[in-house]
């Protein structure tokens, strides 16, 4: 789709902050009003619309995409959406370790142990870790507590949390980013450690490297979305 507007503005409206293109409010793909919960996020979304060139490229508008998802996809099914993310507590990436080679074992421990330690302190839970290939059950109290933490989130925070969880495979790392307990770049380093290790060992493959960079872009965009909500 070609750009059809000249001016972009942020306007306060009933229920939030709207984005206006030449004075007309933006709507989501489902035709709902695109209303943002605070001015900071609204201005960041407006900046994406301002920066659009001759053609609209949704890949360059991640905040808009997450806001659309919050309104169109998450809000109507908030409880079910939260439950889907909470299931990652049953098999968090940080609980599955390599046992060889020693350098990878050390790297995983250096990245993942602090995340689990933070979650233990924050939620008063414990974790079972393993280096086996089979699933290791987590304590029911841990799964329940983390599930409650996710269930308490509003649709916008759930929309922002979702890419962190699904891209990284770690609910613990995603919650740590949400609560600003770890910088997003550090969280990305933790959840991408295995892929980066493989690239180091076997050499860079252009497609694999690009895929990793795309995932990093989406991960950090989601982290920024959450930061703007705080």
Locations of the language-model features?
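Conserved active-site and cofactor/substrate-binding residues in soluble primary-metabolism enzymes
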Residues: 37-40, 76, 110, 166-167, ...
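Long, charge-rich low-complexity segments
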Residues: 209-230
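An N-terminal structural lobe/cap that precedes and organizes the functional/catalytic core
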Residues: 1-76
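Internal, conserved structured core segments that host functional sites
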Residues: 79-145
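Structural signal for hydrophobic packing residues in well-ordered secondary-structure cores
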Residues: 49, 53, 119, 123, ...
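Short coil/turn segments at secondary-structure boundaries
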Residues: 58-61, 131, 203
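An internal, amphipathic alpha-helical element
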Residues: 137-206, 220
